[in-house]
Regions:
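Bacterial N-terminal signal peptides that target proteins for export
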Residues: 2-10
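Terminal "cap-and-tail" regions of soluble proteins that handle hydrophobic small molecules
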Residues: 26-48, 52-54, 154-156, 162, ...
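Terminal, regulation- and interaction-focused segments at domain boundaries
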Residues: 54-82, 103-104, 221-228
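Hydrophobic/aromatic beta-strand elements that line small-molecule binding cavities or substrate pockets
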Residues: 70, 102, 131-140, 164-171
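Beta-strand elements of well-folded, non-transmembrane domains
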Residues: 72-76, 119-123, 137-143, 153-157, ...
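Amphipathic alpha-helical segments
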Residues: 73-97
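Short beta-edge strand/loop motif at the mouth of beta-sheet-based domains
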Residues: 88-130
Length: 310
């Protein structure tokens, strides 16, 4: 891999971009993703941005979707080598403040991940105090020109279902254009629980997509469920980036580097993502890692490679 600077300048594209998935399902695939890139490339190149972001969300009949698009300073092949290894996903996802622990086990045609979630700023002392989210991981496309992985599960915490998390990428020169999307179906109890949570703990928290302009000419950002989901998907995206940036750090120092890198990236979006100071975040993650890491049983697997790698 080429030696590159790890200094990243990010922008959020708030202009309205004219691309939409066709009716009847989620759009994806190399041709569709290439068309999206052509639609937004001018905006993505505004300013000194090595990894610019475009974030959008929507809700239809109780299904919430949020996705982030960006340019990452790695080839698709480098992403393939890193992100087809199940352990890589446990390393990266647990950088997210609300993802406390992760385990995985092999199944016939997939890997079953269990993510342990909690909305607490304190270290998780026991898995009994966390919500479990079980997602099957599959590699759907694997070549030098297109890469796609999917996590999916039928049931989630707080009466949610049909959880889907996907990452796909196409080459753009020596880099990759990446889409990360998260979606789930909300039911009555989950909507009620989220409404209570937002009203109690984060009534003024905002997301990334702009929904208007106030009387002073300042942007108005989305709030509520869509704002919550946008914050989640951007945190997850930044976790992947932080993991990639620290892959070459010696093993004994990598965890500390990952945490600090994730925090650096998240603090670029202080209005949306700031929840605790650096030392608080790092101490929580250290304690959770030391206490919960032994729960992962050894798994003899290096990657989930399909046969169409090019």
């Amino acid at each position: 891999m080429k030696s590159r600077s790890y200094k990243i300048w990010m922008i959020i594209v708030v202009a309205c971009i004219a691309f939409s998935p066709p009716a009847g399902g989620d759009a994806s695939g190399p041709q569709w993703l290439a068309a999206v890139y052509q639609s937004i490339r001018g905006k993505l190149n505004d300013g000194a941005a090595d990894i610019p972001l475009y974030v959008r969300s929507d809700e239809h009949e109780g299904v919430f979707n949020a996705e982030v698009y960006g340019i990452v300073d790695y080839s698709v092949r480098v992403l393939v080598d890193a992100l087809t290894i199940p352990a890589s996903w446990c390393e990266s996802t647990t950088l997210h403040p609300n993802i406390k622990h992760c385990t995985y086990e092999l199944q016939d045609d997939s890997v079953l991940f269990t993510f342990y979630l909690a909305r607490s700023r304190k270290p998780l002392q026991s898995l009994q105090h966390a919500y479990e989210l079980k997602l099957k991981f599959r590699v759907l496309a694997l070549s030098k020109d297109y890469f796609k992985v999917l996590f999916e599960g039928n049931e989630g915490s707080m009466d949610t279902r049909n959880h889907r998390f996907q990452l796909e990428a196409i080459p753009v020169a020596d880099s990759a254009f990446v889409r990360v999307k998260f979606s789930y179906q909300s039911r009555l109890m989950s909507r009620l629980a989220t409404t209570i949570y937002l009203g109690t703990f984060s009534p003024n928290r905002i997301g990334f997509s702009m929904v208007g302009i106030d009387n002073d000419g300042q942007p108005i950002y989305v709030k509520g469920n869509k704002g919550l989901l946008e914050r989640h998907v951007v945190r997850s995206y930044l976790a992947v980036i932080a993991f990639m940036h620290t892959r070459d750090v010696p093993a004994e120092d990598r965890f500390e580097a990952q945490m600090n890198r994730w925090y650096d990236l998240a603090e670029r979006y202080v209005l949306q993502l700031h929840e605790m100071e650096r030392h608080e975040y790092i101490e929580v993650k250290r304690q959770e890692r030391d206490k919960l890491r032994p729960l992962q049983a050894p798994v003899a697997v290096r990657g989930m490679h399909r046969g169409d790698k090019g």
